[in-house]
């Protein structure tokens, strides 16, 4: 069906993105990138914030390459998160003004003050300590990013935008299948807000569907969409884009062989 085709394209572009990132270290085939991407997805399902994806992809490479592979994976995931955050903030802002949310602005102001204070101390702390992300210092991470060719960054962000457009449209297409009366613009505003809210909540990837569903049910309730409909759509999205690919990924995990060392 068309929904499955959209899921295939979603992962096709993710695999292309990974293949391109890895090419800065060594050339790999599309099939190798597919094996690593789906194998990483399978490993990530039972780990917090999909951290298993980093280790799973790294062990496909020789020991001397593994640290850089982790960094490349971090850059690939970060680009997707940046797109989700930017479009999500825009969507959530429009959502707020469209539906006139009943917010306690005094509490919001206090939270913003706390966030600013914490951010200020964090920036100061980063300058005074050896803070690390995924085991790497900020200085090394920045240097690694700077040393990557500009075309790699452009390619990376370009494919991240394409993937975002695909799975967002897939959600909208499911709304149409379930005969939900909602225009494309309104749906995209709510969908982008949903992905933002879901992405900032740490969880096991296997429970990702619960977080997305909760956010979707809450946001779509303002548009008068039935809870059961949103629950069904969110579950289908999860099955198509995570469970189905992870089933194929489990084959690669079960048949995995450590690479020959070059030591």
Regions of interest found by a model, annotated:
Residues 1-37, 94-201, 240-263:
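Predominantly cytoplasmic-facing regulatory/coupling regions of multi-pass membrane proteins
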Residues 29, 50-51, 182, 204-205, ...:
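Secondary-structure boundary/capping signal
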Residues 40:
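Functional transmembrane helices that embed catalytic/metal-coordinating motifs
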Residues 43-138, 209-263:
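Transmembrane helix-loop-helix hairpins in multi-pass inner-membrane proteins
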Residues 43-45, 193-211:
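Transmembrane alpha-helix interface/packing and boundary motifs in multi-pass membrane proteins
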């Amino acid at each position: 069906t068309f929904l499955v085709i959209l899921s295939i394209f979603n992962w096709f572009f993710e695999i292309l993105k990974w293949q391109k990132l890895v090419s800065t270290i060594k050339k790999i085939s599309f099939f190798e990138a597919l094996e690593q991407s789906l194998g990483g997805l399978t490993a990530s399902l039972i780990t917090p914030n999909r951290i298993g994806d980093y280790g799973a992809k790294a062990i496909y490479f020789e020991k001397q390459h593994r640290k850089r592979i982790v960094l490349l994976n971090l850059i690939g995931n970060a680009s997707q998160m940046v797109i989700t955050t930017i479009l999500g903030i825009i969507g959530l802002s429009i959502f707020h003004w469209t539906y006139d949310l009943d917010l306690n602005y005094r509490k919001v102001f206090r939270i913003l003050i706390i966030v600013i204070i914490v951010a200020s101390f964090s920036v100061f702390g980063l300058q005074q300590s050896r803070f690390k992300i995924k085991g790497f210092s900020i200085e090394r991470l920045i240097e690694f990013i700077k040393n990557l060719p500009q075309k790699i960054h452009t390619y990376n962000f370009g494919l991240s935008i394409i993937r975002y457009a695909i799975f967002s449209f897939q959600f909208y297409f499911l709304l149409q299948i379930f005969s939900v009366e909602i225009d494309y613009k309104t749906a995209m505003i709510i969908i982008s807000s949903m992905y933002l809210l879901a992405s900032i909540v740490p969880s096991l990837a296997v429970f990702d569907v619960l977080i997305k569903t909760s956010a979707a049910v809450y946001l779509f309730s303002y548009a008068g969409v039935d809870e059961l409909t949103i629950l069904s759509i969110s579950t289908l999205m999860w099955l198509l884009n995570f469970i189905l690919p992870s089933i194929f990924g489990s084959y690669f995990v079960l048949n995995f062989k450590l690479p020959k060392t070059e030591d």
